[in-house]
Amino acid sequence: MATALCYVPLIQSVWASNLEAEFERISWALHGHGYSRVTVDTEFYLARPDCSSNNIHPHCQSPEQRYKDVRARVDGGLGIRQLGLTLSSDHPGYPDLVWEFNFGCGLHRLPLDLETDNIQPKPQPWPRHQDPRYSNMEPINSYNFSKLLHYSGLLCNFDVTWVFFHSAYDIAFLLKLATFYRPLPPSLSDFYSGITTFFGGSHCIFDLKYLSCCTNHLYGGLDHVSKSLGVERIAGEAHQAGSDSLLTSHTYECMIYACFPFDRAARHAGILYGIHHI
């Protein structure tokens, strides 16, 4: 099933100067205007190559051990560069609303490739260096983002469904932002308690990477899975958080329709690829 879209959504670039105004738009969309699905993608950089807690291959680890690796990296070595957020509605004709939040971490850090677990040899260019329009843009302060995140209506909202692709690090970063960058919880059970508090519990979370593993024919990264379903990237570029969150949202819609009819995806809710499955 290929998606047929007659419009190209605007990916709203968000910096310190327009952060508050864009969160007001998010709050408006969530409160009585039909938007109830949130798709998130994060792009981040590896600040310290030695931040992993051990050298055991993830396939040989328990979920608790995998979580400790994620915690060690997110608390000790990864800097968030961008957060992409797409709001979608089940009502026909409602356009997707897409934001790309630009943070100040990792301007010259090496990006981590989660598919190979290796440091990529060349740093990806920072958007403000690619385009003169961004040269004077001030990156977002994480504390200000966290404060507005709490006021927006995204957190502790049990009417919202959260969608990710390879969710372990995305959710870990979101939880840090929700707790004003406090260290992640020490255990996996405490981590899930935080997820329940801020994101409505496991039944509200779907990991597209895990869902693809539950089919007989979908595998690989986001681009490969989306192409297998006939879903095209209609705005932005790969590895830019806003574009990836939008593509993840469209791919989720298509996958649910094609592979999980009659609400069969519900049985797979709350399973985080990278922690419970790999």
Language-model segments: residues:
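Metal-dependent phosphoesterase core characteristic of DEDDh/y 3'-5' exonuclease domains
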Residues: 53, 78-278
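Entry/capping segment at the start of metal-dependent catalytic domains
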Residues: 2-87
